[in-house]
Regions:
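Lipid interaction determinants
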Residues: 21-88, 96, 101-171
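Positively charged n-region of N-terminal signal peptides that target proteins for export
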Residues: 1-5
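Bacterial N-terminal signal peptides
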Residues: 10-25
Length: 171
């Protein structure tokens, strides 16, 4: 009887292990390395460091960035020198460990209070990707954007000689 129970317990363990392995193969557990890096999440702008070392925070600057599986939604507003500026964007993207590809569907900007401009013409950009110490970095090829470095804790956007924005990952 003990042998029978041991056999059943061993069989149950083996079946459970096999199911776990099959489940992982279908994406229920570990992710496939060929899927590329994952930047999905919502990021909130905490503060901007200007080139002269000044720290700018809300309400002078407010921003939110969301990456879903394949869509990016970006909104940022700032006030500098008494002039309001804002950028809003919706784009599809793909990301691998080698490149970031973006297809912009909507882009709007109001720079230095000059009035808003809209662009719904499809634009396409490809940027090389670098990965180091668990972070991914790239400079989106469209609209003169800053270099972006994303880690598990958040995102840092750097426009050399102009600003460095610090974004916290919310989810």
């Amino acid at each position: 009887m003990k042998t029978y129970h041991a056999f059943v317990a061993t069989l149950a363990l083996a079946i459970g292990g096999a199911l776990l392995c099959v489940g992982m193969g279908f994406g229920f557990g570990a992710s496939s390395s060929s899927a590329g890096p994952n930047i999905e999440g919502t990021y909130m702008l905490e503060y901007r460091e200007t080139a002269d070392g000044k720290r700018v925070m809300a309400p002078e600057i407010v921003g939110m960035l969301s990456y879903s599986k394949n869509v990016r939604n970006f909104n940022v507003y700032w006030m500098m020198g008494g002039k309001q500026s804002s950028i809003s964007m919706v784009a599809k993207y793909t990301l691998s460990d080698k490149e970031y590809i973006e297809d912009c569907m909507y882009y709007a900007e109001n720079m230095d209070g000059k009035g808003i401009t809209y662009n719904t013409a499809a634009t396409h950009g490809v940027s090389p990707v670098t990965m180091k110490d668990g972070a991914i970095a790239f400079t989106p090829a469209l609209h003169g954007e800053p270099m972006i470095a994303i880690s598990k804790s958040g995102l840092i956007a750097t426009k050399t000689g102009v600003f460095t924005d610090h974004w916290k990952k919310l989810d």
